Amino acid sequence: MLVSMSDDLAGFSRQTTVPDGAAGRRFDAVLAELFPEFSRSRLTEWIKSGDVLLNGVLVRPRDPVYGGEVVRLQVVPDIRTDAVPQDIPLDILYEDEHVFVLNKPAGLVVHPGAGNPDGTLVNALLHRDPALAAVPRAGVVHRLDKDTSGVMVVARTLQAQTALVEQLSSRQVHRQYLAVVVSALVSGGTVNAAIERHPRDRLRMAVSDTGKEAVTHYRLRERFRAHTALECRLDTGRTHQIRVHMAHLRHPIVGDRLYGGSLKLPKVGTDALVVMLRGFKRQALHAEVLEFLHPVGALPVRIVAPVPEDLCQLLAVLREDSALFFERERR
């Protein structure tokens, strides 16, 4: 089977021939095998919208093929964003013609929305690569909360985005976070607790038996006298998942004003620790490691985002406080 290809900023095209062995099968099923880089649902949408022709004519997804027909896929991407390009600095950890991998700082919103019409990651991406205007969501594949820092992958083409979204859906993308939580844990574990929108507060998520599956694995990275640094790995990617799960365990993330409640200061903490905890204005959560298969070629990619300065300072103050506390205890 030979597939001819053409791509430009205005769209892309593919052309191939239906093999004789496919005779009698549904067109959408055969199309999914001919173009495995796209999901079947997306291909079905293109059939219905007239972006796929069989021997130059429109057909339905359920229509049979007979073998030997010419399939022409011609897609002109919809311009799906009203966001304007803005010159906002980006910390790019890796890039090629198919993807960006970046280190998002805390405080940067991913998408424009109510209260954040501009100044977002999407605005920055459109400035960095104007062609992203032709990719849904400007190529964003997954999100991080405004005040969560760390590594994100952005697709630069529709094909790359489709492949990465499929990997997320099939749990082939691995994400590891650094989280600093309240209280000194003695061991790691797994939280398997479904999550849905809070019934009364629409800004919050909540553990609920009627929610969507959510699984978080966590292990101890560093233990302090009244706090713990955890490495958290996600099987699922629900909104606020780690924050909700840690609060559910009654070990909320340091600085999490939404799920952590009032500020909790350890007894007889050092002045430096008190100042640090009172002044830490975002959740102590950092997306540190992202592992995925490259959307073109399927080679494994592993990117590490350095721990940001504010978290490094928090960890340093926690170490100093713990050392002084345990030294006093030994006297």
Swiss-Prot record:
Keywords: Cytoplasm, Isomerase, RNA-binding, rRNA processing. Its EC number is 5.4.99.23. InterPro entries: PsdUridine_synth_cat_dom_sf (IPR020103), PsdUridine_synth_RluA-like_CS (IPR006224), PsdUridine_synth_RluC/D (IPR006225), PsdUridine_synth_RsuA/RluA (IPR006145), RluA_PseudoU_synthase (IPR050188), S4_RNA-bd (IPR002942), S4_RNA-bd_sf (IPR036986). It comes from Xylella fastidiosa (strain 9a5c). It catalyses: uridine(1911/1915/1917) in 23S rRNA = pseudouridine(1911/1915/1917) in 23S rRNA. The keyword Ion transport does not apply. Gene3D superfamilies: Pseudouridine synthase (3.30.2350.10), RNA-binding S4 domain (3.10.290.10). Residues 25-97 form the S4 RNA-binding domain. It is an enzyme of class 5 (isomerase). This is Ribosomal large subunit pseudouridine synthase D. PROSITE patterns: PSI_RLU, S4. GO terms for biological process: enzyme-directed rRNA pseudouridine synthesis. Responsible for synthesis of pseudouridine from uracil at positions 1911, 1915 and 1917 in 23S ribosomal RNA. PANTHER family: MITOCHONDRIAL RNA PSEUDOURIDINE SYNTHASE, RIBOSOMAL LARGE SUBUNIT PSEUDOURIDINE SYNTHASE D. The gene is rluD. SMART domains: S4.
